[in-house]
């Protein structure tokens, strides 16, 4: 029974705490135990004081107290348990039941409220979080940071913010103290303050969009050329372009590695990532590794210059991103695994959905052959986090020792594996929130319109990886010319897409396993979603069927299963012309602009002719300008002409893929 001086519904914050929110604030075991005790009739006696402080007195004499304006972790209890205890949870549940008494005994429903945490002023923030915490957060504010602000919707009725290295949710309207974040406890309050300030900036912008990207704080941006680390990296990229990957020695590779370290030390995270990947490609070529790709090297060289040119554009350099952040106890849902490499060395990337953050994270592992050639299936039994790679790629991971980088990569703190557990994934895919679970691919890709080119977007791992709910799996066939499996599918909204998976010798059984899973009642598929030629294409990672999750890259088999032939597709002349031109410029970068070969010149000339025939006159002119530079200009003129042509081609190719 509740005794109150202000009425039984005076604490709207307690009524707004759903079982899921209580679980996040405490843990599932405490919520279950408190619920069970209340169901058994051992409810505490509640008293609401004039200032709306709620006291709960239990039969064993224990008293729990929850003042207004504070979260559960700031409540008090006379029991010996540290932190949030079952008595505080029982106080909330009992209060909700009393508030619902007189109808059917259910808690009073709380309507969805369109509110903004940005309405909380700094005085209230200091009261809730502490002046010292606010001072620490203010230093991050002065450096500046980016955030993605989400306002309440019918599907997700709580405001939330995606910060560079964590997510903050506000489940209780008007109450900052109940904010939830996946950041570790040591930085929790600081992240809450940053999220509130992000909402404040979004509110001042006055946009009606339910999701909007904002840049918060920061001093005026310096001139783009006032960054010596970036200038040094661009100069080394030019040197590599002149010399060519085929002639790059260990001295240049070492200089690039040091340049990448300097960029990272200067918090230029996105160009640092590009230089690190470029250094990895040079090492792959030196080792004659199969994952060396000339087109990727050319794109990375271009990216370094593109980010330098766009240095004044918010988000182009990643200077406002934190290096990494420890996360509190998190539950992640595995979405499968991608294996790349050779028989001598393989890299496995396990993808995890983070439901609380609405993002996909990547955990990467590397293995080298130990007397036996490696492939995806043999990798499946290798140990990762005290379990097999196969179990990890099809499981749910609960951990208190995870760190998340700005690029959404995961690391597990060494020596704390005991705080990490893995259980089968079950039906967790079907319970993922949007935007992780996609039911309408058209709506997903529509949100991509107007975003910056990939060359200057944030370097986020698994940017386009999603789980797609399927309503239909149509024809499945193998294209021997392209060495890829194709399947026509429809999502839950009826939008069609083409599922395409290329054969890779390191995973010989992947296509057979994929075809079998698609033909066995597939209901969901995880994969990288992108647009190509106006259509939607999915590169699959794993498939959910009534029998469970199939990860093709880890499947057994030698690829000898006979697959039905895929239907023929009409080639797209625009895409083909752009692809060939990009490949021709990549070949020039591979051999070096200081020593262009006759075959390279001929290939570029033919590519320019093809571009002209398809109406891409500007692209053709830039290619011919590069050819002219090879004949008469100094090496600096050659690199400038190559860069102008390459930039135009890469952006044109991206725009062509997005056309509807």
What kind of region is each of these model predictions?
Residues 1-660:
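Long, low-complexity, compositionally biased intrinsically disordered regions
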